Amino acid sequence: MEYIQDQNQKISIKRIGEDPVLDVHQKEGVYWLSFPQLDARQEFLHGFSTRLGGVSKEHLYSMNLSFSRGDSEENVRENFRRMGEAIGFDPEKMVFSHQTHTTNIRKVTREDCGKGFSRERDYQDIDGLITNEPGVVLTTFYADCVPIFLVDPVKKAIGLSHSGWRGTVGKISQETIHCMQESYGSRPEDLLAAVGPSICQDCYEVSKDVIDRFKDGFARKYWPELFYEKPNGKYQLN
């Protein structure tokens, strides 16, 4: 277990496997995570925020990046400003998803910049975003669910998808790749893919109805890697 902390809060990072998949960065008190394999592609910028380095208070301490949690708009905007300053992006160039656990993907351009942040979105039910336009910042949001980062260094395109258990069963990663193929001519063999921080199997208890969906969606040979049953009739899902 690894820890990062400021004067008020400690955050634990549980790493799976021997090699460090994620790097931890800090700039002026703002902490974020990144993948070294993607950092090596300097033409692409990415990051995954933590709770540290913002101005929000109490239960939202401190890097709250949601406008829907009861925080002031001023706090959220300042937090995004700090995160953008640390990582190196302009918050006004962000394009937000509208996550409802679908497998819907939206192709975005410079015309979409600011949607969800400084102006209204004209779309709903979008859990994945793709673009090939420089400067556009794809932005998705997470609690327990899995972020999927996709980079095409050949066609200079990127994708970012929110994969909860419903999206995983629905194979949103495949759908995102398919949309990149159709939109930009991407080839799966050229893509770099990274699975971001998410809830671990030890902490993710689900019921039988969820497992039944996974049994329907994945071949039996994968089941031992995906879940195991507990004495209480519940399952731990990976």
List where the protein language model places each region.
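Active-site microenvironment for binding and transforming phosphate-containing groups
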Residues: 1-238
